[in-house]
C-alpha cells in the first residue's frame, strides 16, 4: 500500500532545514523526529493488539530496518523514490513470536479446508495497526513538525556556537 501525504505551510521549516549544511545533520534530525513520533504509534498499536497470549503486542515496535525479504520487496516498490529517511512501525519477528502471525490477525483468513473437504475454520480480522494509524495520523504529523523544528533549532544553534568557537580560536594570537 502506498500513501502520499501533503503538508502545507512548512516553508519556514524547510528554510531552517536548509540551514543545516551537512546532509548527515539533516538525516539525523529527521531520523530523531521520526523516531519520537513513531514511539507513541507503536505503543498505541500494541495496546490495540489482541491479547490471546500477549506475544503479538510485545512484538510491535519501530525501526529503520526491514528483514532481508521485506527490504527486497520495499526496493521494488519504491525503486524510483529517493527518500532520505524512513521509519517503519509494525510487528517484528525479532521482537517476539507474535510477529509471525500479525498479518493474519490484522486482516484475517478465508475459510480453510483439509484435502478431505473438512472445514477447519477461519480467522476473523482483528485490526490493530490500521486503527492505530488512523487515530494517530494527524497527531503524528504535528509531532514530526514540532520535533523537527526543535531539533533543527538545536542543531543550528550548535553549529553557530561551533563556528564562533573556531573563529575565536583562529583570531586569537
Task: Please report, for each region that a protein language model flagged, where it lies by residue.
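Mid-chain, well-packed structural core segment of small domains
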Residues: 74-103
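Short, Lys/Arg-rich flexible segments
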Residues: 1-84, 107-173
Amino acid at each position: 500500500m502506498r500513501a502520499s501525504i501533503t503538508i502545507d505551510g512548512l516553508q519556514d521549516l524547510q528554510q531552517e532545514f536548509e540551514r543545516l549544511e551537512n546532509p548527515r545533520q539533516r538525516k539525523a534530525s529527521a531520523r530523531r523526529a521520526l523516531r519520537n513520533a513513531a514511539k507513541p504509534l507503536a505503543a498505541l498499536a500494541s495496546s490495540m493488539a489482541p491479547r490471546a497470549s500477549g506475544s503479538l503486542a510485545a512484538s510491535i515496535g519501530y525501526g529503520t530496518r526491514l528483514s532481508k525479504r521485506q527490504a527486497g520487496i520495499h526496493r521494488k516498490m519504491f525503486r524510483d523514490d529517493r527518500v532520505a529517511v524512513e521509519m517503519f512501525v509494525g510487528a517484528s519477528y525479532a521482537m517476539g513470536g507474535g510477529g509471525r502471525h500479525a498479518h493474519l490477525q490484522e486482516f484475517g483468513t478465508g475459510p480453510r479446508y483439509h484435502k478431505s473437504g473438512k472445514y477447519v475454520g477461519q480467522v476473523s480480522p482483528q485490526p490493530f495497526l490500521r486503527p492505530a494509524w488512523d487515530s494517530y495520523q494527524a497527531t503524528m504529523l504535528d509531532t514530526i513538525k514540532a520535533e523537527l523544528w526543535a531539533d533543527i533549532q538545536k542543531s543550528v544553534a550548535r553549529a553557530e556556537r561551533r563556528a564562533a568557537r573556531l573563529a575565536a580560536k583562529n583570531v586569537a594570537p
